[in-house]
């Protein structure tokens, strides 16, 4: 038997059709556009350290006021007058055969020439330090570029500036790994993984040595003024050593500028990182109960020296940090604690013998 038909069901509202997503039109790129195409970094975060450093540098930079321009103009006019008067004195001494005055003019000319030469040398070294920041920006662009032809020359220039010989094993491995079909991003990336770690390892060893010396000096010494002078002197030497390793010759003003940039970077960007990496670990291990007050102060001084070296390394390095290869403060912290414990154990065991 057939089943009876079900009655019709009427709905109050008509059925709603689900909206379908419309497809976008096809986009085609030319060959020239495909070469310069670079993927956008969605999760890329702005560099807080650079923003803070630029803000403070702009705040501390003196404004070009009218009085400053008048003073600079007066100094320039005075210098020109001194040079003109010196030329006139020299001519008069030569005409009157006053050899004593002529010798004084010659000595003054030598002093002025030495002063001008030192100013030019300082300016050139300061310009070289500023160029390192531009080279780092250029390297960052090459690491995101798909073009061909600039990466090899750029890396060879960096190797020459750092004093790396052509027969160096790391540079030979880099030459063997690159070929003509690779773009600039791949060539610079290979240089960053094969050649740059050689210089970074030397800089890490220098930071470890200077931080250990600062830690032991503060932990052993009991004179605050001597400690402060020693730490300041060693920190300046550390900055000079790191700059020399990366091929930067520092003068007086360039050294002050680098030291100022490092301190500003530490003050604005390093405080939170220092608390995060050091404070929680110290609280968890209760180092204050295990070590003496002088030892704790020594560890703090060593960590600040290590932090100073890391930031100097970052400012002198020609390439940006990639693949989390930036040295961490925790690595130096564990090393400093181990060295300090060994020193304290040796000092305690020596009187017993």
Curated annotation (Swiss-Prot):
Keywords: Cell inner membrane, Cell membrane, Membrane, Transmembrane, Transmembrane helix. Pfam families: DUF697. Residues 1-35 are annotated as: Disordered. Signal peptide: none annotated. Residues 1-19 have a biased composition (Basic and acidic residues). It comes from the Bacteria. GO terms for cellular component: plasma membrane. The keyword Membrane applies. InterPro entries: DUF697 (IPR021147), UPF0283 (IPR006507). Its main location: membrane. It is found in: Cell inner membrane. The chain crosses the membrane at residues 70-90, 100-120, 213-233. The keyword Zinc-finger does not apply. Coiled coil: none annotated. It is a multi-pass membrane protein. Belongs to the UPF0283 family. PANTHER family: UPF0283 MEMBRANE PROTEIN YCJF. This is UPF0283 membrane protein YcjF. The lineage of its organism: Bacteria, Pseudomonadati, Pseudomonadota, Gammaproteobacteria, Enterobacterales.
């Amino acid at each position: 038997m057939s089943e009876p038909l079900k009655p019709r069901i009427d709905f109050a509202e008509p059925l709603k059709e689900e909206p379908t997503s419309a497809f976008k039109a096809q986009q085609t790129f030319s060959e020239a556009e495909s070469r310069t195409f670079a993927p956008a970094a969605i999760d890329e975060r702005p560099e807080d350290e650079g923003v803070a450093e630029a803000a403070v540098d702009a705040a501390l930079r003196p404004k070009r006021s009218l009085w400053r321009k008048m003073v600079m103009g007066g100094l320039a006019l005075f210098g020109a007058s001194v040079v003109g008067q010196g030329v006139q004195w020299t001519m008069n001494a030569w005409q009157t055969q006053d050899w004593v005055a002529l010798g004084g003019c010659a000595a003054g000319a030598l002093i002025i020439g030495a002063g001008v030469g030192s100013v030019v040398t300082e300016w050139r070294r300061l310009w070289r330090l500023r160029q390192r920041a531009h080279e780092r920006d250029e390297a960052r662009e090459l690491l995101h570029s798909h073009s061909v032809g600039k990466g090899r020359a750029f890396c060879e220039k960096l190797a020459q500036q750092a004093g790396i010989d052509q027969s160096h094993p790391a540079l030979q491995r880099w030459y063997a790994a690159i070929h003509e079909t690779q773009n600039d991003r791949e060539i610079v990336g290979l240089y960053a993984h094969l050649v740059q770690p050689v210089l970074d390892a030397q800089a890490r060893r220098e930071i470890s040595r200077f931080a250990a010396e600062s830690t032991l000096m503060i932990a052993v010494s009991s004179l605050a003024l001597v400690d402060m002078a020693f730490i300041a002197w060693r920190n300046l030497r550390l900055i000079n050593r790191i700059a020399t390793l990366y091929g930067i010759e520092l003068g007086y003003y360039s050294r002050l500028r680098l030291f100022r940039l490092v301190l500003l970077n530490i003050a604005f960007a390093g405080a939170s990182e220092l608390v995060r990496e050091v404070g929680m670990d110290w609280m968890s291990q209760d180092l204050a109960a295990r070590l003496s007050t002088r030892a704790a102060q020594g560890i703090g001084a060593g960590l600040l020296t290590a932090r100073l070296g890391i930031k100097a390394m970052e400012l002198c390095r020609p390439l940006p940090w990639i693949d989390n290869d930036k040295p961490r403060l925790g690595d130096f912290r564990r090393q400093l604690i181990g060295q300090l414990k060994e020193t304290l154990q040796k000092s305690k065991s020596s009187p017993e013998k």
